[in-house]
């Protein structure tokens, strides 16, 4: 207990002032609709397009100085199930040294990405980050729940645009 308290006193005494965080620019795609003009574009390609536009508009920022891309994505399944932030960053041409992190807070996933980026910069852990969000409900996959018995031929298919919880019978 004494060691922990002493350690806490050292940590508290060495904390630095929180950094002020600024939003430099914001870019977005048009708002789409289910099955609309954006329906044939993969979420990682869609996000990469927006990141490229952001970089082009802010060409004085060295892309090597970007430390992380945090993307909010509520429906992490199908094509965007493997860290869509990292995939989009690479597809946008960012260096492989730029990290990517995908967060999920359902409808507030993009907002969570902004909050996480803000907190990281405010704490002094990074200087330049990209916060973003992406979703394509038109491309959300259909799923089949696990069969109750082996070789069951009564498979049901569910649309994931309604969320995952609805197929749970509890």
Could you describe each region identified by the protein language model?
Residues 17-19, 33-63, 78-82, 89-170:
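Acyl-thioester C-C bond-transforming condensing/cleaving domain
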Residues 71-79:
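A glycine-/small-polar-enriched, mobile loop at the entrance of the PLP active site in fold-type I
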Residues 26-31:
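Short polar catalytic/cofactor-binding loops
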Residues 24, 66, 110:
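Residue-level signature of catalytic and energy-coupling elements of molecular machines
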Residues 24-25, 104:
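Residue-level detector of conserved, well-ordered beta-strand and adjacent loop positions
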Residues 65-72, 130:
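Short glycine-rich phosphate-binding loop at a beta-alpha junction
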Residues 20-21, 68:
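A residue-level signal for beta-strand positions that form part of recognition/binding surfaces
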Residues 1-17:
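Short, Lys/Arg-enriched N-terminal segments with co-localized hydrophobic residues
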């Amino acid at each position: 207990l004494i060691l922990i308290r002493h350690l806490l006193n050292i940590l508290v005494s060495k904390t630095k002032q929180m950094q002020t965080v600024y939003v430099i620019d914001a870019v977005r795609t048009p708002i789409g609709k289910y099955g609309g003009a954006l329906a044939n574009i993969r979420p990682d390609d869609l996000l990469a397009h927006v990141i490229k536009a952001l970089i082009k508009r802010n060409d004085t920022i060295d892309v090597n100085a970007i430390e992380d891309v945090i993307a909010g994505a509520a429906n992490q399944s199908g094509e965007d199930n493997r860290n869509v932030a990292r995939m989009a960053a690479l597809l946008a041409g960012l260096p492989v040294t730029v990290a990517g992190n995908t967060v999920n807070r359902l409808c507030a996933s993009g907002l969570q990405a902004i909050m996480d980026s803000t907190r990281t910069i405010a704490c002094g852990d990074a200087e330049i980050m990209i916060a973003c969000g992406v979703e394509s409900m038109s491309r959300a996959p259909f799923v089949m729940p696990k069969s109750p018995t082996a070789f069951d031929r009564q498979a049901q298919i569910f649309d994931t645009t309604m969320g995952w919880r609805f197929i749970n019978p509890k």
